[in-house]
């Protein structure tokens, strides 16, 4: 059974309603290029953090000796990475997120020294400021290296001064001594400000002050309103999706599971669910503050690149660890075998479930999911983005809101925020695996509906 006629992605962006059937496709073709994917599948839990960086740097790996000369490295297992990730500045092997960018230890230290010591005023390029940066040239031209750091997204406001580092260490030592004198010997209880999924984003938890790292942190009125709007928009879009449930091709029951008709029906069933998800994401994006301020081309570019990643986030959100199944639209529940019967490859199915399990361990609530999705949408490094600076500026309030929210919700878990951002790196990996899956479907002569073909740039 064929899937229902769907609309072009190009049609719904400026308006306020869901895509309309029969609309012509006129969106620009997106080249299959962009940021180099990070191979290796979903990321493990991040084992350490760098106290010398501010929280917005999400600098969670090897501490820089020059930032904390008296600090001894902690013993234990080395931080695990996703694979052979590359530094976004010089192309060397990356060690983690530093100052908001996946980068190597060398570029991390260089950027910090440049900011703290005012190196930008002293650097000069002999080649007119056009040097191509790599692991060799990074030592030859400091001006172009600093320029590339900023172009990659490193933020000066994430760098702490020596005085700030010293005060932060003193404050932490005082907190630790107070904790030891007040707490009885034994396992530490859970924080009263921590809560499970579904916590109210604007209630007492988000608006109250925490302890430890969360002490003094409070959401602004604008941040509380932003979170409430995002959560409400997601709920509204989700309810609209339920109304499309009767339109989905039924999952074949009782028929020969290996018959051609049954295989086609299962494939149609999954593609129609994907169409509903895409329409829900487009509808949600239009309600994200700032999205409709962008030009039409950038709206399309951001949606084309982020849709599959948001779909995977929503898939993880619906994962049931007890049954190891994923539920869509309340009534459709699927196991790994069901995904395989629908024509998906094990190489794509297994990472989906691994990612879903990792997300469940984080225990995100509705507000955190909504903020993470908004951050994902406003990714300035997507292919064909015309105004990356504007996109990055729109993303920043959501990053800051998520940082504050997580520090209030789980003040004792300093790694929660960087772990969330690392999940966005995992999504880039899954996105590249998805591209391979789409190519495999084409080899099987399985034709995708027009909307999915357009948004995933499948050209027959």
UniProtKB/Swiss-Prot annotation:
Region (Transactivation AF-2) residue spans: 219-460
Broad class of where this protein is predominantly found: nucleus
Organism field: Homo sapiens (Human)
Entry GO terms, CC: chromatin; cytoplasm; cytosol; nucleoplasm; nucleus; RNA polymerase II transcription regulator complex
Listed name of the protein: Oxysterols receptor LXR-beta
GO MF annotations in UniProt: apolipoprotein A-I receptor binding; ATPase binding; chromatin DNA binding; DNA binding; DNA-binding transcription activator activity, RNA polymerase II-specific; DNA-binding transcription factor activity, RNA polymerase II-specific; nuclear receptor activity; nuclear retinoid X receptor binding
Keywords for this protein: Activator, DNA-binding, Isopeptide bond, Metal-binding, Nucleus, Receptor, Transcription, Transcription regulation, Ubl conjugation, Zinc, Zinc-finger
Quaternary structure annotation from Swiss-Prot or TrEMBL: Forms a heterodimer with RXR. Interacts with CCAR2 (via N-terminus) in a ligand-independent manner. Interacts (when sumoylated) with GPS2; interaction with GPS2 onto hepatic acute phase protein promoters prevents N-Cor corepressor complex dissociation. Interacts with ABCA12 and ABCA1; this interaction is required for ABCA1 localization to the cell surface and is necessary for its normal activity and stability.
Pfam families given in the database record: Hormone_recep (PF00104), zf-C4 (PF00105)
